[in-house]
Amino acid sequence: MRSTLNFNSHWQFTKPGAAPVAVTLPHTWNAADGTDGGNDYFRGTCTYTKEFAAPAHADDEEVWLEFEGAAMTAVVTLNDQELTRHAGGYSTFRVNLTPALAAQNTLTVTVDNSANRTVYPQKADFTFYGGLYRDVHILIVPHSHFALDNHGAPALRVTPEVSDDLHSAAVTVKAACENTPDGTEVLFAIESVGEQTAAMHGG
């Protein structure tokens, strides 16, 4: 069973040339200079740091971190070990903390909203706000789980097909799974008003 924990509080934010300040996510460093109508707001690299104890989890569980948005590029480091890099300020991404997780941890997220020719959009009529401007969550999952690293997308793809007379429907479900032993079967059930109306399973 997956557990989701809010991870928005108790961050330290550092802007170049300034002392760290305590912030709660969501946060952007352009809250003031990005809303005055000019095009002179700060675009550069800033750092978010958080000290935290490892969340309670079983030996056969994994601990992941989910970012709903980091504008525009991000580097995630845990206990001085770089875990991932992400480009794209408007997409969710997740990272497995388990290999570097200790009892007490230092998490550093370096975020950069500088102009970048490899990250879109390139131009817009809005501010390219920098920061961790959406929620961050801890995810605790079994070792065998629906995939979390598919570019932030859900691991389930559901495609309905309704008959022309609207009397019947077929549903195709595809699941991306991680660390599943050979022969593993996934059971899907369709429920309506608390009652199961259909079920199927596949490898």
What residue spans do the PLM features occupy?
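Beta-strand-rich binding/interaction modules
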Residues: 76-78, 166-202
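Generic structural motif
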Residues: 9-11, 156-160, 191
